[in-house]
Amino acid sequence: MLRRLVTSSLSASRSMSASVQSRVGIPFVIDNEGKGERTYDIYSRLLRDRIVCLMTPVDDFIASALIAQLLFLQSESGKKPIHMYINSPGGSVTAGLAIYDTIQMISAPVSTWVIGQASSMGSLLLCAGEKGMRSALPNSRIMVHQPSGGAQGTCSDIVIRAEEITRLKRRLNEIYVHHTGMSYDEIEKTLDRDRFMSAHEALKFGLVDQIETHNGSMPSD
């Protein structure tokens, strides 16, 4: 049942890949197996090695595909680590929390890596990885801030929406507190406005546990 569900979700993911392939050119790889050669799109091939990628804004469609992949890998093994690579500007809070809850629910440890940027909900998913397995590449950028949103309609509707955003803000602050070890007051103050961080600043803040070094020489931060 789960395998059929994941297959359908991955098919949807492939449909999404096809729609952007004309713009970005998603590569295909040939895998030499014992029974012959098989062709995979690169993301499906990486999935075999328990690697998943969040390389877009966070929305419900991306969340559904990523959650399906996490559940599939959990069904394969609840002990082997899953590696999540993040390069995302953030996006929907509820979609991001759906991914977050899945990471926390499964028993397979999830290592997180930021390459490029992990902003907004992307930074929350970065710090949600298994403690000791959260990494940043040297030139990555991380940004945290409070949730934002708009409202229209009657005065009562606007008040209801504002109260919901306030509740989400409080919950996101609590999640950052849990994963960074910072105090609630420190988190609330930091997230009051956009706060951009280098990899080293994110390490000091508690969003990541280590910075992956380049094999070659590079300028210091």
From Swiss-Prot:
InterPro entries the UniProt entry points to? ClpP (IPR001907), ClpP/crotonase-like_dom_sf (IPR029045), ClpP/TepA (IPR023562), ClpP_His_AS (IPR033135), ClpP_Ser_AS (IPR018215)
- The EC class name is hydrolase
Matching Pfam families: CLP_protease
Q: Name one GO cellular component term.
A: endopeptidase Clp complex
Location in the cell reads:
Mitochondrion matrix
The record's section on PROSITE patterns has: CLP_PROTEASE_HIS, CLP_PROTEASE_SER
Molecular function terms, GO-annotated = ATP-dependent peptidase activity; ATPase binding; serine-type endopeptidase activity
Alphabetized UniProt keyword annotations: Hydrolase, Mitochondrion, Protease, Serine protease, Transit peptide
Keyword Transit peptide belongs to the record: yes
Residues of the active site are: S120 (nucleophile), H145
Q: Where is the transit peptide?
A: 1-25
Q: Please give the superkingdom of this protein's source.
A: Eukaryota
The UniProt catalytic activity note for this protein reads: Hydrolysis of proteins to small peptides in the presence of ATP and magnesium. alpha-casein is the usual test substrate. In the absence of ATP, only oligopeptides shorter than five residues are hydrolyzed (such as succinyl-Leu-Tyr-|-NHMec, and Leu-Tyr-Leu-|-Tyr-Trp, in which cleavage of the -Tyr-|-Leu- and -Tyr-|-Trp bonds also occurs)
E.C. designation(s): 3.4.21.92
Tissue specificity: Expressed in the intestine.
* Gene Ontology biological process terms from the UniProt entry: mitochondrial unfolded protein response; protein quality control for misfolded or incompletely synthesized proteins; proteolysis
Q: What is its main location?
A: mitochondrion
Please state which protein family the record places this protein in.
Belongs to the peptidase S14 family.
Self-association or partners: how does it assemble? Answer: Tetradecamer that assembles into a two heptameric rings with a central cavity.
Q: Which PANTHER family match?
A: ATP-DEPENDENT CLP PROTEASE PROTEOLYTIC SUBUNIT, ATP-DEPENDENT CLP PROTEASE PROTEOLYTIC SUBUNIT, MITOCHONDRIAL
What HAMAP family has UniProt attached to this entry? ClpP
The role this protein plays is: Clp cleaves peptides in various proteins in a process that requires ATP hydrolysis. Clp may be responsible for a fairly general and central housekeeping function rather than for the degradation of specific substrates.
The protein's name: ATP-dependent Clp protease proteolytic subunit 1, mitochondrial
Q: Which organism is it from?
A: Caenorhabditis elegans
> What is this protein's gene name?
clpp-1
